[in-house]
Regions:
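Short, small-residue-biased leader/transition segments that mark boundaries at the very start
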Residues: 1-3
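N-terminal accessory regions of nucleic-acid-interacting proteins
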Residues: 6-62, 66
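Short acidic catalytic loops
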Residues: 62-67, 141, 193
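A broadly used, surface-exposed interaction patch
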Residues: 82, 86-107
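Metal-dependent phosphoesterase core characteristic of DEDDh/y 3'-5' exonuclease domains
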Residues: 82-84, 88, 123-179, 187
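Short active-site oxyanion
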Residues: 90, 111-117
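Acidic, Mg2+-coordinating catalytic module of metal-dependent nucleases/exonucleases
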Residues: 168-229
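C-terminal accessory/connector segments of nucleic-acid motor ATPases
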Residues: 211-255
């Protein structure tokens, strides 16, 4: 695995005969590809039905994530859904191919009621998932759980690195997910967001239990699901960065 940047720079900073003790320095393993390979994007009813059937054959909680295009679109709709379950495979679903309220999203939602659903920073993804008809009844939020446990860095990448010794590239986190077709490297990035989410959940669960904060966290997760949805933003374009600089009518039309 790659050495941390500061280790690579050591030869420039010490004398040739100096002895550098680096046995205790943390070394992480890059997570480059899903363990079972990158699945094809699901954009047909037949493929969606097969995915639901495969997930039903699995066991344990569901790792779930959604990709949005917040930096490019005023809406917060989902442009890709990633879901994984032990024994049920990893699946990438194109929600644009089906639309909100499609019967297959209803079938998927019915399946999700049977087990815990794991999300990272759930309040970001739940609105767009609910718009499609996906509304979990039992939630574990790894980001919030880590925050309650007192960890200093609670992003998905830092958590995987600190708790599991795995580094996750995040260079595609702010791309335009509404683009079609989605590039394979973007899809690979998206798949990795759920690749180890179940294992990460177990690590955070243990931290919460050890700290005596598990019940607190579970109550907070339930409160997130019970909270009423936020009202839609009025004129979201008004929140565009740099709007105060727009003076001309033709510039305003672009916004």
């Amino acid at each position: 695995c790659a050495l941390p940047i500061f280790q690579m720079a050591l030869p420039l900073l010490v004398q040739p005969d100096a002895v550098v003790e680096n046995e205790d320095l943390p070394v992480s393993t890059p997570l480059l590809y899903p363990s079972a390979g990158l699945p094809a994007v699901i954009d047909t009813e037949a493929a969606f039905s097969d995915a639901i059937a495969n997930l039903a054959q699995g066991s344990g909680p569901f790792a779930l994530d959604a990709e949005r295009a917040s930096g490019y679109k005023y809406s917060a709709r989902a442009y890709l859904i990633q879901i994984k379950r032990e024994g049920g495979g990893l699946h990438l679903i194109d929600p644009i191919a089906f639309g909100p309220g499609h019967r297959l999203f209803s079938e998927l939602n019915e399946l999700l009621q049977s087990e815990e659903v794991i999300l990272h920073a759930s309040t970001q993804d739940l609105p767009c998932l609910r718009e499609l008809g996906i509304n979990p009844s039992l939630l574990f939020d790894t980001e919030l759980g880590a925050r309650i446990a007192g960890l200093p860095r609670v992003g998905l990448g830092p958590l995987l690195e600190s708790l599991m010794g795995v580094s996750l590239a995040k260079e595609h986190s702010a791309v335009d997910w509404s683009q079609r077709p989605l590039p394979s490297d973007w899809l690979n990035y998206a798949a990795l967001d759920v690749e180890l989410l179940v294992e990460l959940r177990n690590k955070v669960y243990q931290l919460l239990e050890d700290a005596g904060k598990l019940q607190w966290a579970l109550e907070d997760f339930a409160a997130i699901l019970a909270a009423p949805p936020a009202p839609p933003r009025v004129d979201p374009w008004r929140r565009t960065s740099g709007m105060h600089k727009v003076k001309k009518r033709n510039q305003m039309a672009v916004v």
